[in-house]
């Protein structure tokens, strides 16, 4: 079931092979079979995962941390059914997609009819995981003091309800949303004993792990990384403001384009202009003490934004720097054309102009003189399925 899920994620609907397999010694024409529909694939995967859940253990030991459990099978099932209920696969795909997604006989592989029942099945599958009673969200509790890399807790905004004033788990009054989220990905939270982590595959592929990905994310000029991986403006716009509102100007670059004629898909309000000055810095504690020069479109955003996005002017801590060799810590990095990590920086420039800090630990630092040297990169756990997603 898991590998069929990986296939349909990458290629869309695929042929479902018979349980007894096929005789690969026969001619292709004898064993070839058409693709199944997306719904058929999702139903098959769902059924296989139910069978697997009945046979898998409830818990994983220290030596089996990357092995699946009953909860992992049920959580993956919930994800598969959620995707099947989503607009693209539930009657809301654009006509050009429906037309293109057919088999060689012309059979439509994506449903053109909306079915509310799909959402009910996905919700019921998620409830199956929740009712196991084994998982909780990972939190870091609030602290009054800190430094630039491990900042003191910024009080979350008033939600006009009771969530902001109640302690965890009924509210966020005594937790740090920023560190709670960042720690899940940057290696602070280890796999074993993390009640939010439902499934991780581990890492056994040499130079294809998260540590190598981090080296590709780190800035070149000061971090020794490759400065390659970036996100798009659309991904950046997906993060909310700290009060939960959409960011001003969200997706405005698509206004008038095909598929964006619905005004609800973009925000017509202008993006904030100008940059943060020293006199204004105290108004934006989320930027830290080195936030001058940052575009105001990156200010007052939600905690996940600052744990994930390497925006222009963000601080890369790199606490494992070798100061005896002149390496620096807590460096403000800009990706403008005339900057060391910008377009003119030879081969090592960030193509989108917006970097990625997710999975980057404050201590992580690379060495530009050593290819893929991860000795100063914190080991990470791949959070393939988290309880927060359920």
Q: What is each PLM-predicted segment?
A:
Residues 139-389:
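Elongated scaffold/linker segments in the mid-to-C-terminal portions of large proteins
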